[in-house]
Swiss-Prot record:
SUPFAM superfamilies: Double Clp-N motif, P-loop containing nucleoside triphosphate hydrolases. Gene3D superfamilies: 1.10.8.60, Clp, N-terminal domain, P-loop containing nucleotide triphosphate hydrolases. GO terms for molecular function: ATP binding; ATP hydrolysis activity. Residues 555-769 are annotated as: NBD2. It comes from Chlamydia trachomatis serovar D (strain ATCC VR-885 / DSM 19411 / UW-3/Cx). GO terms for cellular component: cytoplasm. The keyword Chaperone applies. This is Chaperone protein ClpB. SMART domains: AAA, ClpB_D2-small. Residues 340-545 are annotated as: Linker. Part of a stress-induced multi-chaperone system, it is involved in the recovery of the cell from heat-induced damage, in cooperation with DnaK, DnaJ and GrpE. Acts before DnaK, in the processing of protein aggregates. Protein binding stimulates the ATPase activity; ATP hydrolysis unfolds the denatured protein aggregates, which probably helps expose new hydrophobic binding sites on the surface of ClpB-bound aggregates, contributing to the solubilization and refolding of denatured protein aggregates by DnaK. Homohexamer. The oligomerization is ATP-dependent.
Length: 867
């Protein structure tokens, strides 16, 4: 027969290959049997499993028979089919014809083998106790009316088992995580499944909120019998789209596979429920020119009610794919799955804690669970609970597990110390002088001492590792006993339940308790096997780059003296520094409004008085680097259309996929200082965008994605009213009343900004012109920066009062602020020092003292042994 199914063709090729490699002259039915048994998912093997045949026993018998086959000398004729194999194929051909099939498949071969008297199959067949007629009935039932009318038809039989995973079987075997909470959603799913029509629930929710977990929870309830009568003994299958599509080479093959799955569900007569995760992938899947996509194949079965289906997808994909197809949408009943509250998320983590403790062999504290939920909610804003909190716990536990398997730091340090001593000892041995003899003896004593300490540390390490490993094994055993108890209760084996519940489990729990106490009572532990909130904070810091640590005493002290820290960089602006410091303190202790940004400030004042410098100082103080400041020069946003630069271009315009500069920056670095420089130069459309940010702490970009801005500090600088401010300060001298200063610039502010914009600003901070004393302090700050750069080259720099007086007089202009001072230092000091360095007049190890001589900066050089 020329027409073989793909599986049989492949088996025949392997049989010929096997005979060739084994140097056999003939390809016998045993070669074919061996190649058929090598594919446990084939129809041939599936039928044998259904009649409870022992595949392992048959494989061993075939291997023995093949070893007894005579071999030929290499280089002789190619192996040819034996007469017995030809007769077997002829018998299989007759079976196919009698069943009305066009292609010879694995079940036809099995029927032919069953009627054969050839060994070893004939002997093995007697162990099965099934007649050929009963076998044929089983195959007919298995086929569910399908005929072998294409080469791939055999693969598509039992499509449900091949392309789906049985969740209820996994639940019965204890391979699913417990599903905590979500009772309302599971109850709603059961309610929809129990309807007469439109009984297909669609779980819709953001990624990571637990849609798949609801399907797993339903499978667990079915196994436990905690479902209505209409759902008892049902099987929940999850469709594997990857397996369904993979390897579908020819047109129509994908549709054929999907139809086989649907046929399997329909043939179960309501006993099977199909769960399709990421159901939107079905829309368009498999569609080519003239072919239907998978969704269209589902519609008739969904409409008739023969397909019981649960779908799961995200809200965006539902709107993009499902809602567009009204015929598909109406066949599903939406169930919205929302993100759990913080309390519910902690409750979910408590239920999962034991699974992760057993897997990683660590202990997870209650504080770690709370920290995982709170910190992930606060700092990881682009993902959803409980998924992100579970990931934190998992990664923190894996970190501890990795440390347990690695060399502890004290042992590593001792080994390094020992290596250094041995190297030193070898160097001393090379010296033959008697003076070194005593030092060599001392070195040997030190090496012996370190070796003893190292041996003691290694012994402690091995003991601790043994205790931790033993504890993990006991917890694994406890989990197995609890699963066995549930299984015994399901099968009504109450003697076994009593033995487990009142004897074995309490005994093992007591052993675990004693082992934990023994581990906790050890002094000077080398290994940490506990996941706590500090470790969770460390993982969050690794993920986000934000220094998330519990507030230490050192940080508390730093926050209390925040004004002094800022005044080291920004001089003469007490109003601004005090207001900003108060805002940061409130945010750090958690008393600021959680629904708004950390702070929104408008810095007003003339140029060069420290507005931008204060923003840089804040970024360095809060996030340890000036680069944490995101700066926008608002002169680039003077046109109406330039607002798209901030939030992204609208659909259809160039740059739509790239996103906006503000939205993308805040998405990647939600903890930042955002500076809008010269805000008054921006177009009014920009202010409308800022209203939403300042009020709700949310920015919606052009793709309708919400960006969390609640952890950013927003600072705007402006020169509005700077002339009025300067005139007022000149007239009044020392300024002590901030409100009086603001009343001077209020009219100018109202001309530029709308009332609703001004109303959303936390504080408007006037920056007053600098005084002579302020300029002297700034000279000191700028000169210290130059001195620090020279100190890196081992050069000490000092200066006298004459230089300070010269720079403060020549470098300050009330119209330009302190910026000319920086230029003057660059011209008069830095340029002169750089020339001296290039000439070799100044070298590392020298001290340079700057002074003035007839309005010229000069320096004295002397050797500086201290540097």
């Amino acid at each position: 027969m020329e027409k073989f199914s793909d599986a049989v063709s492949e088996a025949l090729e392997k049989a010929f290959e096997l005979a060739k490699n084994s140097k056999h002259s003939y390809v016998t039915e045993n070669h074919l049997l061996k190649s058929l048994l090598q594919n446990p998912g084939s129809l041939f093997c599936l039928v044998i499993k259904d009649v409870h045949g022992n595949l392992g026993l048959l494989t061993s018998a075939v291997d023995d028979a093949l070893r007894r086959e005579p071999t030929v000398v290499e280089g002789t004729a190619v192996a040819s089919p034996s007469p017995s194999l030809q007769q077997l194929l002829l018998n299989a051909h007759q079976e196919a014809r009698s069943m009305g099939d066009e292609y010879l498949s694995g079940d036809h071969l099995l029927l032919a083998f069953w009627r054969s008297t050839k060994e070893p199959f004939a002997s093995w067949r007697k162990t099965v106790k099934t007649t050929s007629e009963a076998l044929k009935e089983l195959i007919t039932k298995l086929r569910q009316g399908s005929r072998m009318d294409s080469p791939s038809a055999e693969e598509n039989l039992k499509g449900l088992e091949k392309y789906c995973k049985n969740l209820t079987v996994l639940a019965r075997e204890g391979k699913l995580d417990p599903v905590i909470g979500r009772d309302e959603e599971i109850r709603r799913t059961i309610q929809v499944l129990s309807r007469r029509t439109k009984n297909n629930p669609m779980l819709i929710g953001e990624p990571g909120v637990g849609k798949t977990a609801i399907a797993e929870g339903l499978a667990l309830r079915i196994v436990q019998g905690d479902v209505p009568e209409s759902l008892k003994e049902k099987h929940l299958y999850v469709l594997d789209m990857g397996a369904l599509i993979a390897g579908a080479k020819y047109r129509g093959e994908f549709e054929e596979r999907l139809k086989s799955v649907l046929k399997g569900v329909e043939a179960s007569e309501g006993e099977c429920i199909l769960f399709i995760d990421e159901v939107h992938t079905l829309v368009g899947a498999g569609a080519t020119d003239g072919a239907m996509d998978a969704a269209n194949l589902l519609k008739p079965a969904l409409a008739r009610g023969t397909l019981h289906c649960i779908g799961a997808t995200t809200l965006n994909e539902y709107q993009k794919y499902i809602e567009k197809d009204a015929a598909l949408e109406r066949r599903f009943q939406p169930i919205f799955v929302t993100e759990p509250s913080l309390e519910d998320a902690v409750f979910i983590l408590r239920g999962l804690r034991e699974k992760y403790e057993i897997f990683h062999g660590v202990r997870i504290t209650e504080g770690a669970l709370n920290a995982a939920v709170v910190l992930s909610y606060r700092y990881i804003t682009d993902r959803f609970l409980p998924d992100k909190a579970i990931d934190l716990i998992d990664e923190a536990a894996s970190l501890i597990r990795m440390q347990i398997g690695s060399l502890p730091l004290p042992i590593d340090e001792k080994e390094r110390e020992l290596s250094a001593l041995i190297v030193k000892q070898e160097a001393i041995k090379r010296e033959q002088a008697p003076a070194y003899q005593e030092e060599a003896e001392d070195m040997q004593k030190a090496i012996d001492r370190v070796k003893e300490e190292l041996a003691a540390l290694r012994l402690r390490w091995d003991e601790e590792k043994g205790l931790i490993t033993g504890l993990k094994e006991k917890k694994n055993a406890l989990e197995n006993l609890k699963f066995a108890e549930e299984e015994a209760e399901r099968t009504a084996d109450y003697n076994r339940v009593a033995e487990l519940r009142y004897s074995l489990i309490p005994s093992l729990e007591e052993e675990i308790h004693l082992a934990e106490e023994a581990l906790n009572q050890r002094d000077g532990r080398l290994l940490q096997e506990e996941v706590d909130e500090r470790l969770i904070a460390q993982v969050v810091a690794n993920w986000t780059g934000i220094p998330v640590q519990k507030m230490l005493e050192g940080e508390s002290e730093k926050l209390l003296v925040l004004e002094e820290s800022l005044e080291e960089r920004v001089v003469g602006q007490p109003f601004a520094i005090a207001a900003v410091s108060d805002s940061i303190r409130a945010a750090r202790v958690g008393l600021s409004d959680p629904q708004r940004p950390l702070g929104v400030f408008l810095f007003l004042g003339p140029t060069g008085v420290g507005k931008t410098e204060l923003a840089k100082a804040l970024a360095e103080l809060l996030f340890n680097k000036e680069e944490a400041m995101i700066r926008f020069d608002m002169t680039e946003y003077m046109e109406k259309h330039s607002v798209s630069k901030l939030i992204g271009s609208p659909p259809g315009y160039v740059g739509y996929e790239e996103g906006g500069s503000l939205s993308e920056a805040l998405r990647r670095r939600p903890y930042s200082v955002v500076l809008f420089d010269e805000i008054e130069k921006a177009d009014k459309e920009v202010f409308n965008i800022l209203l939403q940010i300042f009020d709700d702490g949310i920015l919606t970009d052009s793709k309708k994605r919400k960006v969390n801005c609640k952890n950013a500090l927003f600072i705007m600088t402006s020169n509005i009213g700077s002339q009025e401010l300067a005139d007022y300060c000149t007239k009044k001298g020392t300024i002590v009343d901030k409100e009086a200063v603001l009343s001077v610039v209020a009219p100018a502010l109202k001309n530029y900004f709308s009332p609703e914009f001004i109303n959303r600003i936390d504080d408007i901070l006037p920056f007053v012109p600098l005084t002579t004393e302020d300029i002297v302090k700034i000279v000191g700050i700028q000169m210290n920066r130059v001195a620090l750069r020279l100190l890196e080259r081992k050069i000490s720099l000092t200066w006298d009062d004459s230089l300070v007086l010269f720079l403060s007089e020549q470098g300050y202009d009330s119209a330009f602020g302190a910026r000319p001072l920086k230029r003057l230092i660059q011209q008069k000091v830095v340029t002169m020092l750089s020339k001296a360095l290039l000439k070799g007049d100044i070298k590392p190890g020298m001290a340079v003292e700057l002074t003035m001589a007839k309005d010229v900066v000069v320096f004295k050089i002397k050797t500086n042994p201290a540097v």
